[in-house]
UniProtKB/Swiss-Prot annotation:
Name used for this protein in its record: PXMP2/4 family protein 4
Presence of the UniProt keyword Transmembrane helix in the record: yes
Intracellular or extracellular location(s): Membrane
Transmembrane helix listed as a keyword: yes
Cleavable signal peptide: none
Protein family (similarity comment): Belongs to the peroxisomal membrane protein PXMP2/4 family.
GO cellular component: cytoplasm; peroxisomal membrane
InterPro entries, per the entry: Mpv17_PMP22
Pfam families xrefs: Mpv17_PMP22
TM segment ranges: 63-83, 100-120, 141-161
Length: 185
């Protein structure tokens, strides 16, 4: 057991070191990995319900690419922007940040998600527009139910260097929801 704890402590130390040295790259890799996990969880559930279905590795890789290329970098810079304009670690500033996030970033992020996934899937512009019409609003409304509480905790209690990591861990469930929404026809 002590070897496991030592190994975990070393992994944590290495991760924190990389987070300080290469914040955007570390957050991008973390996001990509956790998006891969999210989609794998969804597919695992789908496979348990439909024995004829096969694991879609390309689908999981598209999720990972989106997490890596968009989610990690976007939220690194977005949270920096919010911290610059609302620097106090107070409940008031946490509430302001989460409100701005829900009104500005969340709708844009959900648009980017469905558009980006459509592009990665090789869909036509018309197909992407149809997907947005079908699922964007439902996803945004769900986002408004789930993320305000998480973001309040994030902005009020989590240090700025760890905000994207915290969001990514919470995002495992949300990423699974997004994967399910994106795979629905």
């Amino acid at each position: 057991m002590s070897r496991l704890l030592v190994g975990l402590k070393l992994a944590q130390s290495h991760y924190l070191s990389q987070l300080h040295k290469y914040p955007v790259a570390t957050k991008a890799v973390t996001s990509g990995f956790l998006y891969l996990i999210s989609d794998s969880l969804v597919q695992g559930i789908e496979l348990s319900r439909d024995k004829d279905k096969k694991y879609d590795f390309k689908r999981s890789m598209r999720m990972a690419v989106f997490g890596f290329a968009v989610t990690g970098p976007l939220f690194h810079y977005w949270f920096k922007y919010l911290d610059k304009h609302f620097p106090k670690k107070s409940y008031r500033h946490a509430f302001i940040k989460l409100t701005i996030d829900q009104v500005v970033c969340s709708p844009v992020f959900n648009f980017l998600f469905f558009s980006g996934m459509g592009i990665l899937e090789g869909k036509s512009k018309d197909d992407i527009v149809e997907k947005l019409k079908k699922d964007w609003l439902t996803t945004y409304v769900s986002d408004c139910v789930v993320w305000p509480f998480i973001n309040f905790v994030n902005f009020a209690y989590i240090s700025s260097i760890h905000r994207v990591t915290f969001m990514n861990v919470c995002n495992i469930g949300w990423g699974a929801f997004l994967a399910k929404m994106n795979s629905s026809h």
